[in-house]
Curated annotation (Swiss-Prot):
<feature type="compositionally biased region" description="Basic and acidic residues">
    <location>
        <begin position="241"/>
        <end position="274"/>
    </location>
</feature>
<dbReference type="InterPro" id="IPR000504">
    <property type="entry name" value="RRM_dom"/>
</dbReference>
<keyword id="KW-0832">Ubl conjugation</keyword>
<feature type="modified residue" description="N6-acetyllysine">
    <location>
        <position position="30"/>
    </location>
</feature>
<feature type="modified residue" description="Phosphoserine">
    <location>
        <position position="330"/>
    </location>
</feature>
<keyword id="KW-0007">Acetylation</keyword>
<keyword id="KW-0804">Transcription</keyword>
<feature type="compositionally biased region" description="Basic and acidic residues">
    <location>
        <begin position="62"/>
        <end position="80"/>
    </location>
</feature>
<dbReference type="Pfam" id="PF08081">
    <property type="entry name" value="RBM1CTR"/>
</dbReference>
<keyword id="KW-0507">mRNA processing</keyword>
<feature type="modified residue" description="Phosphoserine">
    <location>
        <position position="261"/>
    </location>
</feature>
<feature type="domain" description="RRM">
    <location>
        <begin position="8"/>
        <end position="86"/>
    </location>
</feature>
<feature type="modified residue" description="Omega-N-methylarginine">
    <location>
        <position position="125"/>
    </location>
</feature>
<feature type="modified residue" description="Phosphoserine">
    <location>
        <position position="91"/>
    </location>
</feature>
<feature type="compositionally biased region" description="Low complexity">
    <location>
        <begin position="362"/>
        <end position="371"/>
    </location>
</feature>
<feature type="cross-link" description="Glycyl lysine isopeptide (Lys-Gly) (interchain with G-Cter in SUMO2)">
    <location>
        <position position="80"/>
    </location>
</feature>
<dbReference type="InterPro" id="IPR003954">
    <property type="entry name" value="RRM_dom_euk"/>
</dbReference>
Length: 391
């Protein structure tokens, strides 16, 4: 990195502190015309620091002087004479490191950004809905209050997707569950339509997220592992909640309609599983009164809900049409009408509505709440579904 200073400039080191510019000029002047003699002095004492720079007009003269004078004695001291080099701070070396540094941090930042983007990415992969779901959840959570924090960040990333998801949800409902979708709409209409609608939209989002459920789940788990865990504890309730509320309530219908077609029922189930695993949903649900009350019962289900439910879901998903279908249909239908309202209301959106629909809710809540999730659900499902067991 050392660069030679301008040609003709010599560094003279090891000088006697008594040697001055005139002496240097006298000694080196015999090699050629000297342009400058710079004796380095201490700022405070103004004494020679023992080295100087002599600049010759001709580089050739400088070379001769360096060759002849290097190691010679001047004023009793052997001096060192060589081509002057630029100080390291002037060489540009100093400049270079900063660029790397500046670059480095940006890289890190970029990486960080990329990472964050990546995290977002997966969810979006899962589906915008996932994000949407998150946002919805978050939204819901926010309505709940505590949950929002956990989900807060995701919502941002998910924020945009939610919008998409909501639309997608409706689309799904229109396509797959045209009938149901309308139903959900009706439900929405029914209790505090405005309130519900927001929920429904969220649900839609949820649905979509659930569809994306996997991704949601993944994203959730990855994103909100902690929350998922927390939610897991919660999860059970939320799940129930989800099932009940969502599944049963119009949301389920909505889900079914939306999530349904998209999920193929699969999504829905998965949504549920997602919820369980996601936990955020659970949390959200948890926030809901029902899930809260139910949590204890559901406590066990969480794990069960997560795995078995998943399985159930899977099976039901596969046989989703059949068992779940009936389940969902019975549930959704029963739920949709009663639970729908109840579920929505239960969610705590329209408490008044909730109260209005106590009966469905009771049955619904009793099934979900009273029994552990698995049991309750199974029971409720069978009740709802008729003989159909959960599966």
């Amino acid at each position: 990195m050392v660069e030679a200073d301008r040609p003709g400039k010599l560094f003279i080191g090891g000088l006697n502190t008594e040697t001055n510019e005139k002496a240097l000029e006298a000694v080196f002047g015999k090699y050629g015309r000297i342009v400058e003699v710079l004796l380095m002095k201490d700022r405070e004492t103004n004494k020679s620091r023992g080295f100087a720079f002599v600049t010759f007009e001709s580089p050739a003269d400088a070379k001769d002087a360096a060759r002849d004078m290097n190691g010679k004695s001047l004023d009793g001291k052997a001096i060192k004479v060589e081509q002057a080099t630029k100080p390291s701070f002037e060489s540009g070396r100093r400049g270079l490191p900063p660029p790397p540094r500046s670059r480095g941090p940006p890289r890190g930042l970029r990486g960080g950004r990329g990472g964050s983007g990546g995290t977002r990415g997966p969810p979006s992969r899962g589906g915008h809905m996932d994000d949407g779901g998150y946002s919805m959840n978050f939204t819901m959570s926010s309505s709940r209050g505590p949950l929002p924090v956990k989900r807060g960040p995701p919502p941002r990333s998910g924020g945009p997707p939610p919008k998409r998801s909501a639309p997608s949800g409706p689309v799904r409902s229109s396509s797959g569950l045209g009938g149901r979708a309308p139903v959900s709409r009706g439900r929405d209409g029914y209790g505090g339509p405005p309130r519900r609608e927001p929920l429904p939209s969220r649900r839609d989002v949820y649905l979509s997220p659930r569809d994306d459920g996997y991704s949601t789940k993944d994203s959730y788990s990855s994103r909100e592992y902690p929350s998922s865990r927390d939610t897991r504890d919660y999860a059970p309730p939320p799940r129930d909640y989800t099932y009940r509320d969502y599944g049963h309530s119009s949301s389920r219908d909505d889900y079914p309609s939306r999530g349904y077609s998209d999920r193929d029922g699969y999504g829905r189930d998965r949504d549920y599983s997602d919820h369980p695993s996601g936990g955020s949903y659970r949390d959200s649900y948890e926030s809901y009164g029902n899930s809260r009350s139910a949590p204890p019962t559901r406590g066990p289900p969480p794990s069960y809900g997560g795995s078995s439910r998943y399985d159930d879901y899977s099976s039901s998903r596969d046989g989703y049409g059949g068992s779940r279908d009936s389940y969902s249909s019975s549930r959704s239908d029963l739920y949709s009408s009663g639970r729908d309202r109840v579920g929505r209301q239960e969610r705590g959106l329209p408490p008044s509505m909730e109260r209005g629909y106590p009966p469905p809710r009771d049955s619904y809540s009793s099934s979900s709440r009273g029994a552990p999730r698995g049991g309750g659900r199974g029971g409720s499902r069978s009740d709802r579904g008729g003989g159909r067991s959960r599966y």
